[in-house]
Amino acid sequence: MSSRITKQRLEDLLDRINQATGHKLEAWTQDETGRNRANVGTYVLDWAYGGVRLSQLTNEGGGERDITGRGTKRETYYRMHAFLDGLDAGQRGE
């Protein structure tokens, strides 16, 4: 029997990915003028159309690039684990 993949489990895995890549855990930061700015490079979860995907912020306005395709929570969980495994292998020089 497999365990339930929850939003919290995806968010925990997202934090691990951001930590492994040296990016901030928060997607947005308020600057000195009070405007919200995206933390460029930070990985985020994009929820829409009943699914979720892993994306990365590409500019201060909140533009994103897709890292994975949109899928169910379980599909995205497995894709995020594969992504993290690839990061770990690259850092080990494999």
Regions found by a protein language model. Name each.
Residues 43-50, 82, 86:
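Short, charge-rich amphipathic interface segments used for partner binding and complex assembly
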Residues 45-63:
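Short aromatic-glycine-(Arg/Gly/Cys) micro-motifs in beta-strand/loop hairpins
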Residues 1-41, 58-78, 82, 90-94:
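Negatively charged, low-complexity tracts enriched in Asp/Glu with abundant Ser/Thr
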